[in-house]
């Protein structure tokens, strides 16, 4: 009977932080496996926000989600890690030898250590809370933007008040014929620089309004608005409506993996160690004092977790070197 291969490090989650962690593990010459539940690598950045422009990634004045994921994939393949997509991790058992068996939708895998980089978990968009024809989705009503060209020379309304809604309104401004931004509050809760850019833009700000109804009108959409604590009920006629009310995440897998959590995510210490020795967590999946839900933060956490995992396996091995001494 053949002996099952045991990886040194298995990274669960193929978003930007997970991909970088797998690359860094290769930089440390670790035998690494990367598991992703979706059909493609990229996480939310690649699958939900490919056209969104990111401004807080070191070395990039600005970069789209799609281009960032492309660069990370190029970086990842340098050390030829084992990558398996469409693979959902169901449970993680610890074996008598102290290593782990990951039971997945594509079979079992063994690993000496595990790095969890699952982001916010499985995600679905918060839907518009009014009745509308589902056939409008993907044609006139959108929850995701795969390609900005879909909105070229169109009258577009964006609904939402957070960073994502503001970012999309600004990204669509030079592409669309005109953009309106609908929010139920008088003030937006986005980054100060983004709000300042919005106020200087040509985007029409519709606040404080709720969407009362969305109905087809010829080849357009009629959006009935209702003023919050007021009587005004204007109608906005657009070609396309983009809803940005955030996402509902499903983190049931964390319970199945027996990891301690709080309301924000997986509890970790300063070495990114979870409540189960040998299992580490990084990125938006984790919770600790001062944690920021940024890709940039996750990029910093990845080397910490990888180096700690390798120190656990090989206490006498030299500590991490600078990349100029490792990369070839």
From Swiss-Prot:
GO MF, any single term: flavin adenine dinucleotide binding
InterPro entries given in the database record: FAD/NAD-bd_sf (IPR036188), FAD/NAD-binding_dom (IPR023753), Fd--NADP_Rdtase_type_2 (IPR022890), Ferredoxin-NADP_redctase_2 (IPR050097)
Keyword Iron in annotation: no
Cofactor binding note of this UniProt entry: Binds 1 FAD per subunit.
Pfam families, alphabetized: Pyr_redox_2 (PF07992)
Cofactor(s) needed by this chain: FAD
Enzyme class: oxidoreductase
EC nos: 1.18.1.2
HAMAP family: FENR2
Oligomeric and partner information: Homodimer.
Family stated for the protein in its record: Belongs to the ferredoxin--NADP reductase type 2 family.
Protein name, entry field: Ferredoxin--NADP reductase
Source organism (scientific name): Lacticaseibacillus paracasei (strain ATCC 334 / BCRC 17002 / CCUG 31169 / CIP 107868 / KCTC 3260 / NRRL B-441)
